[in-house]
């Protein structure tokens, strides 16, 4: 399973320093310095095209930090090919750029299937970047220790985090929150999360998201209202980013965290969406989850605005509407077209394309296409994809049934612990011989090794993407 099985068997804080450096490049370097502010501001509001254009102008003049800015955008696409390019860019700049050291370290922490050598390289880079004054290094370092304890047998993550806390490092508290999330003890430590994040709120705006989560889980509307008031004031002053406001709004609209406050979420998103296009899609998702907030015309307006800003989540959600046929008439061809535009940037796009091809929604079953997309989705962390692959191999629609591969993917799907997955795994295991089961378990382990050992937590992705201040970039 390491390879794909066949279907029948897939502003300028650095301005003065840069002007001095520009003497060795060209006077145009100083003339181009305002572009760094344009790039930073564009990136903060989600306008990656403008950011990329301005970073490119500086990168062409030889500015390593601008090259790192371009790599940041590549990482943000979630496209494996672009992430590979970003890794090479970070690595080339790491000798002279502490920021590149931190970025490369974080990228290696989040890299699926990273080698033990890469784990230790990440540790060294993050420690070096921390010593050079870079922020957002202890959180990914904590994730490294938590995610790959076998690579660091002499490191106790909790003890290390406690040492950081005793030393007074600002990131240490959030590293503790990360430990709670990773070890699934977050709900047992809500009071501690609140204490940590209230203390860090003025310097670390991701704490707005954590506190909003805590107050939703605690059903504490008074505390939540005070937090939102403080956040909106910070947003007006420019100390809280639109990305954070968007994230908090999505917490408010998440019914799995407690009683949702969808109307407040909608009001927050509508305030920031004109300057932060990703929020148009968050608004559409909110309307999808709470249809009473609007109608299909409102939904299409939100999605059109998101698509105009090249937001892949907009293509994904529009594809879902045509796939499900709830808001608009079902149209598998239209769904396919929108999902294809989101492929490489939204993992779920591969999942839905795989389901279209597996279920024959285009008039017939396309088993190899289905497998290719579903396997990509599964390897990128889409929870339901393994179950769909097990169904593909066991049902034999459009292809010959393959009991061994069906068993392998049913075992992988069983990790999701849903009744359907457990039932299918039990059903597919029964007719196999002991030898076949042993072979299947070897293939399961091989596939797990291909994917990496753990799914990425939301906080880990923050650790990869998070920038303390958009102005820091250059």
Please place each PLM-identified region on the residue numbering.
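Hydrophobic face of amphipathic alpha-helices that form TPR/SEL1-like repeat modules
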Residues: 69-76, 105-111, 141-147, 178-182, ...
């Amino acid at each position: 399973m390491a390879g794909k099985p066949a279907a029948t068997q897939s502003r300028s804080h650095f301005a003065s320093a840069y002007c001095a450096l520009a003497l060795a490049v060209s006077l145009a370097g100083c003339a181009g310095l305002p572009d760094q502010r344009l790039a930073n501001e564009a990136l903060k509001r989600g306008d990656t095209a403008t950011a990329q254009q301005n970073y490119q102008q500086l990168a062409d003049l030889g500015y390593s930090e601008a090259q790192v800015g371009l790599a940041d955008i590549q990482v943000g696409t979630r496209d494996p090919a672009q992430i590979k390019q970003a890794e090479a860019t970070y690595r080339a700049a790491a000798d002279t750029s502490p920021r590149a050291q931190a970025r490369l370290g974080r990228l290696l922490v989040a890299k699926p299937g990273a080698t033990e050598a890469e784990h230790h390289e990440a540790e060294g880079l993050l420690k070096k970047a921390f010593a050079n004054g870079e922020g957002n290094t202890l959180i990914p370092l904590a994730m490294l220790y938590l995610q790959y304890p076998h690579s660091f047998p002499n490191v106790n993550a909790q003890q290390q985090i406690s040492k950081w806390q005793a030393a007074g490092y600002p990131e240490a508290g959030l590293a503790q929150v990360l430990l709670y999330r990773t070890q699934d003890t977050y709900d047992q430590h809500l009071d501690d999360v609140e204490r940590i994040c209230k203390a860090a709120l003025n310097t670390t705006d991701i704490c707005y998201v954590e506190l909003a989560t805590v107050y939703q889980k605690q059903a504490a509307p008074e505390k939540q209202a005070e937090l939102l008031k403080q956040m909106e004031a910070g947003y007006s002053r420019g100390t809280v980013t639109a990305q954070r406001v968007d994230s908090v709004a999505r917490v408010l609209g998440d019914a799995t965290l407690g009683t949702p406050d969808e109307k407040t979420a909608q009001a927050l998103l509508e305030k920031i969406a004109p300057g932060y296009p990703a929020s148009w899609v968050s608004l559409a998702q909110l309307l999808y989850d709470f249809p009473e907030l609007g109608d299909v015309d409102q939904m299409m307006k939100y999605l059109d605005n998101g698509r105009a800003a090249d937001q892949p989540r907009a293509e994904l959600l529009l594809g879902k509407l045509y796939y499900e046929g709830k808001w608009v008439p079902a149209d598998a061809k239209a769904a396919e077209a929108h999902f294809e535009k989101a492929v490489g940037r939204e993992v779920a796009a591969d999942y839905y394309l795989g389901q279209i091809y597996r279920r024959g929604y285009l008039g017939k079953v396309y088993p190899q296409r289905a497998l290719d997309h579903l396997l990509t989705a599964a390897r990128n962390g889409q929870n339901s994809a393994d179950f769909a692959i097990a169904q593909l191999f066991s049902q034999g629609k459009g292809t010959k049934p393959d009991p061994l591969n069906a068993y392998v993917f049913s075992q992988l799907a069983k990790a999701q612990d849903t009744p359907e997955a457990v039932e299918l795994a039990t059903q597919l295991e029964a007719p196999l011989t002991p030898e076949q089961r042993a072979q299947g378990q070897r293939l399961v382990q091989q596939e797990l090794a291909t994917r990496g050992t753990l799914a990425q937590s939301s906080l880990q992705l923050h650790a990869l993407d998070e920038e303390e201040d958009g102005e820091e970039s250059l």
